[in-house]
Amino acid sequence: KWVGLVYQRMTLISDGGDAPISSLSGQLSPAEVNMDLTMCGLLVDRAEELAQLYADKGNWNDVKEIWFDERLSNRSTRGSSQKIYRVLTSRFKNAPTSLPNPSVLPRVFDQCDTSRDKAQILYLYLVSDDSLVRYVVHEYSARVSRGEPDPLDFSNETLSTILGNLTYSDGSSFDYAESTTERWCEGIRSVMREIGVLEGQQTVVGDSPSVGTIPLLVA
């Protein structure tokens, strides 16, 4: 249920007055947090391809074999393909039961009108799987709920402040190299562009996007 609430808050959809979503700061362990978003964003086309393979084959071992055979025949590097495969399949494998099983996603995608609709659905899998993205989305949801000016400001400055406020359950703090953090910030902006929060490559302050009918049903 919280996934739907987060999506509602981020997109300013009325949620019937539910209690504010609490911060995840202090609740996550360092082991739960990673920078996978620096490797790949939503990658709608590739995620759709993986979901179709899984729907066809029914198991991830066959999907992996076919995926790498096709990548290598297209002269992709194995290292790059492995990273993308690991990150994208993790989002599917760790999805809560409240989201569609990846085996039925191709049918869900067939009902989508636009690539943005598909991105808005894949965003839910990302938020469910990636603890750092989830923490940041919770913080932005709180900014929207509090009525802050420019609540959806995804500038490096605002993002860095939010990331810097993250403390782990063991008392330690978020601590990554500045260059890595900047790549992560660009990654989250890329996601926000794909789901319609940010418009244009240079825009860093967003607005509530229109949400497609199918993404709303999924959320």
Go through each PLM region and give its residues:
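Short amphipathic alpha-helical interaction segments
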Residues: 80, 178-191
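DNA-recognition alpha helix
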Residues: 154-171
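Accessory, usually C-terminal, subdomains that scaffold auxiliary metal cofactors
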Residues: 179, 193, 197-219
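Surface-exposed cleft-lining segments at the edges of enzyme active sites
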Residues: 170-178
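Acyl-donor binding region in acyl/amide transferases
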Residues: 148
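Eukaryotic partner-binding/assembly regions in large regulatory complexes
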Residues: 11-132, 136-139, 145, 154
